[in-house]
């Protein structure tokens, strides 16, 4: 089982090395060339627990022993999620909603970032690497807190998270600023998420920087979905949700379903593509964007162009113009053509745009659909679904639900991925339903609970009473300097 870089066929690593390194030296992402060679036996997995399905999926992507995989899964999830099924499926009138927000930070990132630290620890042991790992992560809001919580006080790891100072919700910012753990550091930057993510990627290919870290017995890795170890765990909930529908006789085994996915960085929906490649019967993967609809434009025209205004929306975790994981999809759709991917990514870096061939676009359209919703439509959808189904959506899930309603498919069951608790974006959710009078986010959190009776997640209840521990704000150009200065604190 060998991983290679999307941009260079000669850069090959085993699974443990790929998880630890995160990003290839020249900037490519690690992929399995023969993805789909081995398939899941779905019939055998019907009625199995989340843990058992996760073990079966991991076997297709890592070279760990049965015992190692089982231990990773158990330590990642047992007792850490508020629902025994980890990612429960809820039936509404038009579709099913896959609730991915029952983890320790109330966002879907918890699923991947609870397992990644366990995969990292196991990989360190397997490759007999004596260096510690520095996790560098950019976040548009949810990844940061989930990564901090996942890696908090994990032996031989240090983690630094960078977020756009004015580009996350009040709750998201407070979650990160109050983070505990002796190996954690959080810093805001003046700029947007793309600035933070680009800064991190540049450090991964900065040989001088990596040598300086190595002199301190430290190696770089990432908790973003550019790390294959973050992406693999997300494949599991696609499989689990499908098997749930089969087990409860909502569909028959081998019936195809649609998945509607709110996404900015393309990682969450790419996990659905991986699930389809290992045998899941998928009709369409529907990509739902907000007004930063660079992915919608690409999936409908074949032109990816980030040369546009960056818009702040009520779904800030999707306020992204550079969708990193699209590179992995293009690698597979192009027939694993590393040179072609290298050229596209060079075009993107130099001109801010690239265009794929008609053949590649047709292959993408065979499996993917796309839609988008603006802020007004998002808030209208929150109100409509609450009134119709007595179900409370967060802003990102509402984007996906609006796209679902615009593309209703009566022939196939549809599953909408719900990526966060509505309480992470309380002001936007509350004002979609009720009048506001200038209250702060935490006051509105309690008012939303009083009005809807939807339970506030335990990790958010007293968030405003926690001590602010991380107050640093820097210019985006100063990330490298900041990291080297603060390493000694971890």
Question: Model-derived features: where do they sit?
Answer:
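PLP-dependent amino-acid enzyme catalytic core
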Residues: 1-490
